[in-house]
Amino acid sequence: GHVPCGKDGRKCGYHTHCCNCCLSGICKPSTSLIGCSTSSFT
């Protein structure tokens, strides 16, 4: 299921400890400073 994450609380299809939602279903670690990851976190 989707979980809320990121500053704006957008829902994301993947979950990881401290994640930011960029585009739908795309997450990146909150420590990442460069754009969004193209990989999915489970």
Curated annotation (Swiss-Prot):
Signal peptide: none annotated. Disulfide bonds join 5-19, 12-22, 18-27, 21-36. InterPro entries: Conotoxin-I_CS, Toxin_19. One of its GO terms (molecular function) is sodium channel regulator activity. Expressed by the venom duct. Keywords: Disulfide bond, Ion channel impairing toxin, Neurotoxin, Secreted, Toxin, Voltage-gated sodium channel impairing toxin. It is found in: Secreted. GO terms for cellular component: extracellular region. Belongs to the conotoxin I1 superfamily. Iota-conotoxins bind to voltage-gated sodium channels (Nav) and act as agonists by shifting the voltage-dependence of activation to more hyperpolarized levels. Produces general excitatory symptoms. The cysteine framework is XI (C-C-CC-CC-C-C). This is Iota-conotoxin-like R11.16. It comes from Conus radiatus. The lineage of its organism: Eukaryota, Metazoa, Spiralia, Lophotrochozoa, Mollusca.
